[in-house]
C-alpha cells in the first residue's frame, strides 16, 4: 500500500465516523430520556469496543500477534487515549450544540501539530500548518459560529480532543513497531475492559437503567452499527494505513468528519442547511488540498 491508497482508505474512515456521530447522538438521546446519560455513555463505549473486537481474532495473524507482550503494552497505551477520548466526548455531547462540539473536538488537529512540534523541537511544513488552521476553522464554523461558555462540558470536550491527538501520535509510533492488526485487537479489548470496570461502579448507583437500555432497540441499533463500522472497520483501517502518512496530515484528513456528520444531520432533519455549511465545508476541503502539497512520508 502506498500513501495515496492509505489516504483514500482513511478518507473512507471519515465517512464512517460521520455516520458514527449520528448514531452516537441517537443513543445518547435515548440514554438521557432514561435519566442515565453518564451510564449510557459508558455502556455505549464499553459495548462498542467489546462487540467491535469480537471479529478480530478471525483475521489472519491476530492469534500469533496476541502472544507478544509488546502488542499488549502498546495496546494499553492506545486504549487509554481511545477510551478516555470517546468517553469524555460522549458525556459532554448531550450538553453542547453540534457547532460547539464539532469545533472543540476539532482542536485535536491543533494539539497534534503542537505536541509533535514540542516532541521534535521544530514546526511542521508550511503546507501542513496552513491545513491545520483551515480545517480547525472549517470544523468550528460548519454549523455556524460556536458560542462558547467555558463550562465543564466544553472543557471535557477539549480534554477529549487532547486525548484524540495523543491517540493519533501514539498510533503512528506503535503501528511501526508491532503488528497493526494485533494492536488493534489488544487496544480494543483493553478499552472494553476499562469500560467494564467503570460500568460496574456506575451500576451501583443506577442498576435498573442498565437493563432498560439493553432492552431498548433505539439504543441497541446505533450501538451495533458503531461497533462494526466505527470500531472494527474504522480502527483496523486506521492502524493499517495511518503509519504511511504524517500524523498531522492524518489529523487534517480526519477533520473531514464534520462535513459528513453535518450532511447526514441535515438529511435526517437534525439541523437545517445554511451558508455556514459551504463556508466550513469549503475550508475543510481547502485545508486538505493544501495539506496535500506537503512532502509525503516515505511508504517504506
Predicted ranges, named:
Residues 1-43, 88, 146-173:
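Glycine-/small-residue-enriched transmembrane alpha-helix faces in small-molecule transporters
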Residues 23-36, 140-152, 202-218, 222, ...:
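Membrane-interface helix termini and inter-helical loops of multi-pass transporters
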Residues 27, 44, 92, 97, ...:
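Hydrophobic/aromatic residues within transmembrane alpha-helices
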Residues 34-84, 111-115, 134, 163-170, ...:
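Transmembrane alpha-helices of multi-pass small-molecule transport proteins
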Residues 47, 83-87, 101-108, 170-193, ...:
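Helix-helix packing/entry segments at the starts of transmembrane helices
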Residues 55, 61-64, 89, 108-130, ...:
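C-terminal transmembrane-helix exit sites in multi-pass transporters
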Residues 56, 124-144, 164, 275-295:
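Hydrophobic transmembrane alpha-helices of multi-pass small-molecule transport proteins
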Residues 57-101, 105, 134, 139-141, ...:
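Specific transmembrane alpha-helical segments of multi-pass solute transporters/efflux pumps
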